[in-house]
Amino acid sequence: MSSVFGSVHILAMIAIQLLLTHSVSSLNLTNAYLHHKCSNTQGKYKQGSAFEKNLNLVLSTITSIGNFRDGFRYTEEGEDPNNVFVMFQCRGDSYWSKCPPCISTAVSGLRRRCPRNKGAIIWYDQCLLKISSVASFNKIDYENDFYLSNPNNMSDRGLFNKETSALLEKLAYKASDRNNLDGKQLVLYAAGEKRIGTKKVYAMVQCTKDLIFTKCFECLEGILRKFPQCCDGKRGGRVFGTSCNFRYELYPFLRNYSNSTMRAPY
Ligand SMILES: *[C@@H]1O[C@H](CO)[C@@H](O)[C@H](O)[C@H]1NC(C)=O
Ligand SMILES: *[C@@H]1O[C@H](CO)[C@@H](O)[C@H](O)[C@H]1NC(C)=O
Ligand SMILES: *[C@@H]1O[C@H](CO)[C@@H](O)[C@H](O)[C@H]1NC(C)=O
Ligand SMILES: *[C@@H]1O[C@H](CO)[C@@H](O)[C@H](O)[C@H]1NC(C)=O
């Protein structure tokens, strides 16, 4: 299939304000808008159409029904050819009651930025929301990657790249480990930290929970290959797809980091 949304690479500059507003010592839990894509190929729906009705129904109920223990939902509303697929995934530290506020923000953000689009994705710090007329369960989306990075460089670029990549790689293994379960469900998320010289790097990786563990690993390996483009020597960086993403910073940006990763020797 050809690109549904087209691919995009955002230059570092966009992230400057976002990344420079943090200090090492304070945990500021932001939920900044990051990016969106309106699908051109899926077209627009008409006012009063069955698609609109289905979309309105699913978006009006999405934050009020069900539980948010895994911060994820993939749901379908209506019947072919007017069915709507909606997926959201909250960040791994933003489940339960932390999740619905981000989704509400994302719903209004998506409606404002992609009015009447049948397909659209919006990214925030703490969640992702996607609507589509095309099913995507357990399919890696390779078409909508983008990255954000802090324009400032580390002095020891080589060491920093090597050690940060190694941390992310380790987290990718952990996130996609089939034995890394929350009850019976795959966790598909991992966070950790690591000392590099005098600095400490904080990092996370995550997949959307429609993926099976092998696909999660495949997705993460795909975006980790973009580390050189995104993140070469940068003091902070993130690569996003729709199906997975990673982030690292020199300050803590999550509500908590897992103990096992923190204690692991490097
Ligand atoms: C963190 O957030 C607090 C409250 O919103 C703000 O006063 C403070 O300046 C922020 N710190 C940084 C480093 O942005
Ligand atoms: C973060 O901490 C809370 C409460 O201690 C816990 O319920 C939650 O599972 C933790 N999240 C992660 C990702 O470890
Ligand atoms: C970081 O390094 C790159 C590549 O060497 C350079 O183009 C860029 O200007 C540097 N950024 C800063 C803020 O010095
Ligand atoms: C994580 O580490 C903290 C501090 O070392 C400890 O108090 C806490 O019980 C640990 N949590 C788990 C789930 O092991």
Curated annotation (Swiss-Prot):
PANTHER family: CYSTEINE-RICH REPEAT SECRETORY PROTEIN 29-RELATED (PTHR32411:SF54), CYSTEINE-RICH REPEAT SECRETORY PROTEIN 38-RELATED (PTHR32411). Residues 33-136, 142-253 form the Gnk2-homologous domain. Its main location: secreted. It is found in: Secreted. This is Cysteine-rich repeat secretory protein 41. The lineage of its organism: Eukaryota, Viridiplantae, Streptophyta, Embryophyta, Tracheophyta. It holds the Pfam family Stress-antifung. The keyword Transmembrane helix does not apply. PROSITE patterns: GNK2. Keywords: Repeat, Secreted, Signal. InterPro entries: CRR_secretory_protein, GNK2, GNK2_sf.
